[in-house]
Amino acid sequence: MSNISFSTNPNIAPSAICDLREAVGWARQEEDYPAALQGYWATVGGFDVANTLVAWCAIVSDGVRNAVLLDVIVHPLHQGKGVGRTLVAKAIEHIKAHHITIIHVDFLPERTAFYQRCGFRVGLGGIYEA
């Protein structure tokens, strides 16, 4: 894995997350992130040696039983090097430290093998978009 350091609940400018989203081909959603960052239960960031955000995910939780991983993102230059698996592992570690036992994640079918390698069991679920 490349020289990436991980931090839970790092102080990140919304624009850094938007830059990372854009790097993977997602919409920047700049107008959403100031409020979204306030609503997350936790976040995990991965930073390169220049302290640039290269990996990130958000966690929402009831704080008791359930947590959901959102927006697991790794910059394309760092994909395929174990950064994503470490990012997810750090998120799971933080969740388990709070005695939360059920962790959910939604993903596209082409990401199934990745999440299985991270320890997730694939089951049926549903997404409702308003």
Label each PLM-derived region with a short phrase:
Residues 1-32, 47, 126:
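Short amphipathic alpha-helix that is part of the acyltransferase structural core
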Residues 9, 75, 108:
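Residue-level recognition of the GNAT/N-acetyltransferase active site
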Residues 32-40, 47-50, 54-73:
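A conserved beta-strand-loop-helix scaffold within acyl/acetyltransferase catalytic domains
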Residues 78, 82-90:
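Conserved acetyl-CoA pyrophosphate-binding loop and the N-cap/start of the following alpha-helix
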Residues 95-107:
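Conserved GNAT acetyl-CoA-binding A-motif
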Residues 104-113, 129-130:
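Conserved beta-strand-loop-alpha-helix junction that forms the acyl-donor binding cleft
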Residues 118-126:
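Conserved acetyl-CoA-binding loop of GNAT-fold acetyltransferases
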